[in-house]
Curated annotation (Swiss-Prot):
The keyword Transmembrane helix applies. HAMAP family: TatB. Residues 130-139 have a biased composition (Polar residues). This is Sec-independent protein translocase protein TatB. The Tat system comprises two distinct complexes: a TatABC complex, containing multiple copies of TatA, TatB and TatC subunits, and a separate TatA complex, containing only TatA subunits. Substrates initially bind to the TatABC complex, which probably triggers association of the separate TatA complex to form the active translocon. One of its GO terms (biological process) is protein transport by the Tat complex. Belongs to the TatB family.
Amino acid sequence: MFDIGFSELLLVFIIGLVVLGPQRLPVAVKTVAGWIRALRSLATTVQNELTQELKLQEFQDSLKKVEKASLTNLTPELKASMDELRQAAESMKRSYVANDPEKASDEAHTIHNPVVKDNETAHEGVTPAAAQTQASSPEQKPETTPEPVVKPAADAEPKTAAPSPSSSDKP
């Protein structure tokens, strides 16, 4: 892969031994070997995926060629039935797009608040200057009506205490 000869590998090993020392050199070699292993596996994976995609593309191209060749040899009855099937499939696709379950689900989970909508319509003609003058106007207190004072029932009638039997009353 790297086209390194034995003498060059020995030279790299000696330089690594001098720079890193005998204690850190094995750890560095293991780390570099792990990186090389990961890069090789990544390259192999990418290569396999590209090969599969190319095979799939070639298969699809050959399938299209066969379909075109077979369509020219079809009888008019088969062509008519294939056209009907295509139209049915298109209408199903259109109806599915029109009744998209994700949109219906989103609509079902949406909270509609008419108060906020009415609030927005109430503030349509208000400019920032008008809002500022309204905010800086003196505070108005709401009118209060005095509430009648109601006496609790416990205070209205005095209670008479009935003698309760106690443990000292026993004969």
